[in-house]
Amino acid sequence: MRTDSSKMTDVESGVANFASSARAGRRNALPDIQSSAATDGTSDLPLKLEALSVKEDAKEKDEKTTQDQLEKPQNEEK
Protein backbone atom coordinates (compact mmCIF):
# COMPACT_ATOMS: atom_id res chain seq x y z
CA MET A 1 0.00 0.00 0.00
CA ARG A 2 1.51 3.30 -1.06
CA THR A 3 0.62 6.62 0.43
CA ASP A 4 1.27 10.16 -0.63
CA SER A 5 4.76 11.04 0.60
CA SER A 6 3.60 14.50 1.72
CA LYS A 7 1.28 12.93 4.30
CA MET A 8 2.86 11.25 7.31
CA THR A 9 1.12 8.47 9.17
CA ASP A 10 1.11 8.15 12.96
CA VAL A 11 3.95 5.64 12.82
CA GLU A 12 6.07 7.81 10.59
CA SER A 13 5.68 10.82 12.87
CA GLY A 14 6.72 8.65 15.84
CA VAL A 15 9.80 7.52 13.94
CA ALA A 16 10.67 11.11 13.12
CA ASN A 17 10.27 12.14 16.77
CA PHE A 18 12.47 9.27 17.92
CA ALA A 19 15.14 10.04 15.33
CA SER A 20 15.25 13.71 16.32
CA SER A 21 15.51 12.90 20.04
CA ALA A 22 19.14 11.69 19.75
CA ARG A 23 18.26 8.48 21.57
CA ALA A 24 19.48 5.42 19.74
CA GLY A 25 17.72 2.85 21.90
CA ARG A 26 16.67 1.72 25.32
CA ARG A 27 20.14 1.96 26.82
CA ASN A 28 20.24 5.67 26.11
CA ALA A 29 17.02 6.13 28.07
CA LEU A 30 18.65 4.91 31.30
CA PRO A 31 20.24 8.26 32.24
CA ASP A 32 16.83 9.92 31.86
CA ILE A 33 15.30 7.47 34.31
CA GLN A 34 18.17 7.68 36.78
CA SER A 35 18.25 11.46 36.87
CA SER A 36 14.58 11.78 37.77
CA ALA A 37 14.71 9.05 40.43
CA ALA A 38 18.01 10.14 41.95
CA THR A 39 16.59 13.42 43.22
CA ASP A 40 14.15 11.79 45.66
CA GLY A 41 16.35 9.34 47.53
CA THR A 42 15.10 6.57 49.79
CA SER A 43 15.53 8.10 53.23
CA ASP A 44 11.89 9.21 53.35
CA LEU A 45 10.54 5.99 51.86
CA PRO A 46 9.18 4.57 55.15
CA LEU A 47 7.21 7.78 55.74
CA LYS A 48 5.77 7.65 52.23
CA LEU A 49 4.80 4.00 52.63
CA GLU A 50 3.17 4.71 55.98
CA ALA A 51 1.09 7.43 54.37
CA LEU A 52 -0.19 4.90 51.83
CA SER A 53 -1.76 2.68 54.47
CA VAL A 54 -5.46 2.08 53.85
CA LYS A 55 -6.18 -0.17 56.83
CA GLU A 56 -7.56 2.64 58.97
CA ASP A 57 -9.80 3.89 56.18
CA ALA A 58 -11.26 0.43 55.64
CA LYS A 59 -11.76 -0.03 59.38
CA GLU A 60 -13.55 3.32 59.70
CA LYS A 61 -15.77 2.51 56.72
CA ASP A 62 -16.73 -0.86 58.23
CA GLU A 63 -17.52 0.81 61.57
CA LYS A 64 -19.70 3.42 59.85
CA THR A 65 -21.56 0.74 57.88
CA THR A 66 -22.15 -1.24 61.07
CA GLN A 67 -23.36 1.89 62.88
CA ASP A 68 -25.73 2.73 59.99
CA GLN A 69 -27.15 -0.79 60.07
CA LEU A 70 -27.77 -0.54 63.82
CA GLU A 71 -29.56 2.78 63.42
CA LYS A 72 -31.73 1.59 60.52
CA PRO A 73 -33.00 -2.00 60.84
CA GLN A 74 -33.31 -4.09 57.67
CA ASN A 75 -37.12 -4.16 57.65
CA GLU A 76 -37.18 -0.35 57.30
CA GLU A 77 -34.93 -0.45 54.22
CA LYS A 78 -37.64 -2.17 52.09
Curated annotation (Swiss-Prot):
Biological role stated in the UniProt entry: Extremely potent competitive inhibitor of cAMP-dependent protein kinase activity, this protein interacts with the catalytic subunit of the enzyme after the cAMP-induced dissociation of its regulatory chains.
Region (Disordered): 1-78
Record GO terms (molecular function): cAMP-dependent protein kinase inhibitor activity
GO cellular component: cytoplasm; nucleus
The protein's name: cAMP-dependent protein kinase inhibitor beta
Metal-binding found in the keyword field: no
Compositionally biased spans, kind Polar residues: 33-42
Keywords recorded for this protein, A-Z: Protein kinase inhibitor
Organism in which the protein naturally occurs: Homo sapiens
Biased composition (Basic and acidic residues): 1-10, 53-78
Gene from which the chain derives: PKIB
GO BP, sorted A to Z: positive regulation of telomere maintenance
Coiled coil (residue ranges): none
Entry's family note: Belongs to the PKI family.
Marked site: Important for inhibition: 23, 26-27
